[in-house]
Amino acid sequence: MGQTLTRRDVLRTGAASAGATLLLGRSLSEATAAAEQQVGSFRYCLNTALLRGYRLGILEQVELAGGAGYDGIEPWIADVQKYAASGGSLPDLKRRIADRGLVVESAIGFAPWIVEDAGERAKGLEQARREMELVSQIGGKRIAAPPAGAVEGPAIPLSAVAERYRALLEAGAAIGVVAQLEVWGFAKNVSRVSEAAYAAIEAGHPDACLLLDVYHLYKGGSGYQGLRQLSRQAVRVMHMNDYPAIPRERIEDKDRVLPGEGVAPLSEVLSTLRANGCATALSIEIFNEGYWKKYDAKTLTALGLERMRRAVAGLR
């Protein structure tokens, strides 16, 4: 059975990993890479969506994530852009993230790389390149690639989705950032794991992978049994949350709750990822106004981590 070995554990103990002994003093990037190779392991990440209601800047988000004890952070591109536009230094932001013991596990962007119109798609691909460059400059190696721009409208053939995803992966490979094909359960396109898996396989690119979300698996009707078919390389980041007993046809993004406060089969999801051998960053993603009214930012940040750890600790 796999274990939950975080990057912090690696740095602190010099634990054996992936067939090699990790020694204290090795670089943060080396320790992170080793943690990512731990079969059936989990790391803990703050998707800054959890804090959006507080309207904090990226530096405040980093401080909260580091102070709470997360292993990584998943910022929104818009927040990084706002920081840079106001005169902030990206190299300095990269250092601050590392100084707080964090890695940039992923980033949230909405480039319309998938759309049908060729001209708009070219613009979307160029936007994605700019955003991936930004991610690279702050030390990140992954970015979300949701079906932005194709939420409504006609269904796009999966062969075309695969072709467009490959183009996105090739753009990312030149930069050193992997685009993760994200499932949006409410969208007309790429709303199910099976659709995303087909496109990722058909893309025929070694970096192809999926970005999944507990809520979106339910919303899109994917279910959870299909996760057993995914390889250990398929899911490098998983958006963690829970949801109440609302029919999937009516449930919305804002209804997501903290792990353990809903009815999602979290043990099944996490056990499957572990059995598959995935080394996955669990990234808490919730947009619940009720929490923003009930808790201050520091408390909610800590709760997100505590609830994810509790979910993993409950696995057999």
Model-derived regions: residue spans:
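Active-site-proximal loop/turn and secondary-structure-junction residues that shape catalytic pockets
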Residues: 50-52, 77-79, 110-111, 147-151, ...
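Histidine-acidic metal/acid-base catalytic patches
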Residues: 2-45, 50-68, 190-212, 216-316
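Conserved beta-strand positions in the central sheet of alpha/beta enzyme cores
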Residues: 74, 106-108, 144, 180, ...
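Metal-dependent catalytic neighborhoods of phosphoester/phosphodiester hydrolases
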Residues: 83-90, 118-121, 294
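Active-site acidic/histidine proton-transfer and metal-coordination neighborhood
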Residues: 14-25, 36-39, 62, 96-100, ...
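A short acidic, helix-capping loop that chelates divalent metal ions and anchors anionic groups
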Residues: 79-81, 112-117, 151-155, 220, ...
